[in-house]
Amino acid sequence: MAAPIMLCDTAGMSNDRWLECRMHGPKGDIPYTVGGSDVAAIFGVSPWTTPLELWLIKKGRMKPPKKMNADQLAMGHMLEPIAAEWYARKSGNHVYQDTGLYQHADHPYALANFDRKYIRASDGDDG
């Protein structure tokens, strides 16, 4: 399997620009994208979005609903560095922030932002 393609660095990017990149890629040339946050909706287990709603949003036939879980999102962002530090201490792995927006090599609609990556202490390999 080919390595993911880094499309751009999102460090310092405005939230609106980041959302544009997530929706259509940094050049705006991807008709629709699927990210990690969409997977729960695709499988029908999201408490916020149904598969039909997601399809309508991706096709531009429905506006995304306002974030009903804004407090949970904010808390998650606040706790990310703490969780990363805890994992690093427990595992011995080196954890670092990654601000890239990546595209799957075989499926150009599949995009991802990795909040953190790690280097395994056992062999120095990326994880």
Q: Which residues are covered by each model-predicted region?
A:
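A short acidic/basic microdomain associated with nuclease active sites
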Residues: 88-108, 115-117
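Glycine-centered structural positions embedded in regular secondary structure
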Residues: 75-77, 100, 112
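Signature of the catalytic double-stranded beta-helix
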Residues: 76-94
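Charged, glycine-rich intrinsically disordered N-terminal tails and low-complexity linkers that flank
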Residues: 1-82
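Active-site beta-strand-loop-beta-strand hairpin of nuclease catalytic cores
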Residues: 117-127
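Short glycine-rich, polar/acidic loop-and-turn segments at beta strand-coil junctions
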Residues: 59-61, 85, 99-101
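Short, hydrophobic/aromatic alpha-helical segments in well-folded domains
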Residues: 83, 113-115
